[in-house]
């Protein structure tokens, strides 16, 4: 499971935990945008589309920042390859966004 692999590699590393926290914040923001998307009118979607795209880009950037750090610490970070890269297949962008929504969901459940 990708999330379990992430958490194992992050461990108690304070810098990795900070990067993970930043990722969770942007993932939660992105998930909120996605959750409301179907409730928006066409006009509202048009107005908010660039913001959604920007937030999605930020999610990808934060995943990459965490991976870069973990690799510098000698971790495999193979979970990032499992998510895929937009450059290899445009569909991977959607998968990364979906995984960000999953992270926000898990975070919400754990907040009980």
Listing of model-derived features with the role each one plays in the protein:
Residues 2-27:
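Short, charge/polar-rich alpha-helical segments
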Residues 17, 23-26, 30, 37, ...:
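Heptad-repeat amphipathic alpha-helical coiled-coil interaction surface used
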Residues 35-99:
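Acidic, low-complexity, intrinsically disordered interaction modules
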Residues 109-112:
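Short acidic DE-rich linear segments
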């Amino acid at each position: 499971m990708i999330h379990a692999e992430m958490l194992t590699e992050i461990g108690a590393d304070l810098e990795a935990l900070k990067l993970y926290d930043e990722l969770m914040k942007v993932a939660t923001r992105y998930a909120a945008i996605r959750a409301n998307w179907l409730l928006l009118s066409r006009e509202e979607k048009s107005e908010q589309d660039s913001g959604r795209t920007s937030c999605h880009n930020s999610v990808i950037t934060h995943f990459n920042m965490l991976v870069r750090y973990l690799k510098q610490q000698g971790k495999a970070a193979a979970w990032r390859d499992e998510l895929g890269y937009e450059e290899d297949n445009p569909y991977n962008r959607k998968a990364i966004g979906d995984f960000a929504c999953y992270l926000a969901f898990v975070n919400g459940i754990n907040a009980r």
